[in-house]
């Protein structure tokens, strides 16, 4: 467990029992009970293998704002992080707000355990207005059959961290570092990670903007603004091509601007047609792609549809 001024984080550790060295976690009983009058700011999960190119749940649904408790999204719960506005029933009215903010989330998810979601209890244990939520495992059918909703872990083994952040204003919610504070590095980095600023044509021009001339214009824009990078989005493999990407990388380097490249994550788990495809789902192809990017000076990647 970890406790600080505005954060609480906890996880479960399962020890080996007699000769049993593996456990399958069928269900988690962690629950959060919020007081009556609490309102919610939540992102509902969609059913698996629906939506655009069967990519859901893709965590791109709209948040419901200042909504009442007791709902369960579109019957599939909510994606983390989950924000709640809690009323202080005994706080003084007037100058100071009588509300507080609570953020429930998770961190430390890796390949040994599944990510979770937040579900609303059908029958709140405290009565009231349905302010009881609990950790749910993934939906059956997600990822088109890749993986299992009940993780098997070698013992001793641990769950991801469950986190709660509380603040009288939204500042502690926005500024919390709890997702990083409790997670240990998996390996030593070759270089220090540095934050940077960049530009991105797709957010305005979408797929047609992913062409050589427009990306060169965005490199010039980033350089003029003092930004460090440009994100070249989907379809660069067909609308720009590898030789021209290398040329853009050289041009960007001359301007002090590095490139990030978009990749489709998919192997068998969705039908998203945008390329490059089938280069990030298998180790051999991924390593070859990373070597090529390193050789031409690409700074990093954006992986989509996962």
Model segments located where?
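Sequence-level detector for tyrosine residue identity
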Residues: 12, 59, 63, 74, ...
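Alpha-helix boundary/interfacial micro-motifs
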Residues: 53-54, 184, 243, 273
């Amino acid at each position: 467990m970890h406790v600080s001024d505005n954060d609480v984080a906890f996880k479960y550790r399962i020890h080996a029992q007699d000769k049993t060295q593996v456990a399958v976690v069928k269900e988690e009983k962690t629950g959060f009970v919020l007081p009556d009058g609490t309102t919610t700011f939540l992102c509902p999960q969609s059913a698996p293998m629906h939506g655009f190119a069967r990519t859901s749940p893709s965590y791109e649904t709209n948040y419901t704002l200042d909504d009442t408790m007791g709902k369960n999204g579109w019957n599939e719960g909510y994606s983390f992080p989950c924000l709640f506005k809690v009323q202080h029933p005994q706080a003084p009215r007037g100058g100071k707000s009588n509300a507080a903010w609570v953020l429930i989330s998770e961190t430390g998810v890796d390949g040994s355990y599944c990510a979770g979601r937040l579900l609303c209890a059908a029958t709140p244990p405290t009565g009231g207005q349905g302010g009881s939520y609990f950790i749910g495992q993934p939906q059956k059918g997600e990822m088109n059959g890749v993986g299992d909703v009940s993780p098997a872990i070698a013992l001793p083994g641990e769950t991801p961290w469950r986190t709660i952040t509380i603040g009288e204003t939204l500042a502690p919610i926005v500024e919390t570092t709890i997702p990083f504070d409790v997670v240990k590095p998996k390996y030593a980095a070759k270089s220090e990670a540095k934050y940077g600023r960049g530009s991105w044509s797709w957010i305005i021009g979408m797929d047609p903007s992913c062409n050589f001339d427009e990306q060169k214009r965005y490199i010039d824009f980033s350089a003029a603004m003092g930004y460090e990078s440009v994100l070249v989005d989907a379809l660069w493999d067909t609308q720009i091509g590898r030789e021209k990407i290398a040329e853009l990388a050289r041009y960007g380097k001359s301007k002090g601007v590095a490139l990030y490249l978009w990749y489709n994550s998919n192997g068998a788990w969705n039908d998203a047609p945008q390329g490059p495809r089938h280069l990030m789902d298998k180790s051999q192809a991924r390593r070859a792609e990373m070597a090529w990017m390193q050789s031409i000076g690409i700074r990093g990647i954006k992986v989509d549809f996962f």
